[in-house]
Amino acid sequence: MKFISTSLLLMLLVSSLSPVQGVLEVYYTSLRCRCVQESSVFIPRRFIDRIQILPRGNGCPRKEIIVWKKNKSIVCVDPQAEWIQRMMEVLRKRSSSTLPVPVFKRKIP
């Protein structure tokens, strides 16, 4: 009797785990790669509206870089392209550097 109740409890526990995983997958809107084809052709900075970096995850085994151009076209860029690596390094340095905060000193009477 103890064995049957234990096995039933175990089966109930295992069957309840799959919906939890499904709830967590809601946060991943698409569980596949967004870029079908990647380009390594240089895009001048003046034509770029924004850049989105998608790290590798459950749905896609590779890192993806998506560039939105000002003419509303979207280009998937090869993350190994030298020009995009240099551009990302420049952007990282800009975002990590902080402007000095002005210090106002009060004169104590």
Curated annotation (Swiss-Prot):
UniProt entry keywords in alphabetical sequence: Chemotaxis, Cytokine, Disulfide bond, Inflammatory response, Secreted, Signal
GO biological process: antimicrobial humoral immune response mediated by antimicrobial peptide; B cell chemotaxis; cell surface receptor signaling pathway; cell-cell signaling; cellular response to lipopolysaccharide; chemokine-mediated signaling pathway; chronic inflammatory response; defense response to bacterium
Gene from which the chain derives: CXCL13
Pfam families: IL8
PROSITE patterns per the UniProt record, alphabetical: SMALL_CYTOKINES_CXC
Subcellular localization(s) per the UniProt record: Secreted
UniProt family annotation: Belongs to the intercrine alpha (chemokine CxC) family.
One GO MF term: CCR10 chemokine receptor binding
Tissue note: Highest levels in liver, followed by spleen, lymph node, appendix and stomach. Low levels in salivary gland, mammary gland and fetal spleen.
Protein name per UniProt: C-X-C motif chemokine 13
Record function comment: Chemotactic for B-lymphocytes but not for T-lymphocytes, monocytes and neutrophils. Does not induce calcium release in B-lymphocytes. Binds to BLR1/CXCR5.
First and last residue of the signal peptide: 1-22
Native source species: Homo sapiens (Human)
S-S pairs: 33-60, 35-76
GO cellular component: extracellular region; extracellular space
Domain of life: Eukaryota
Lineage: Eukaryota, Metazoa, Chordata, Craniata, Vertebrata
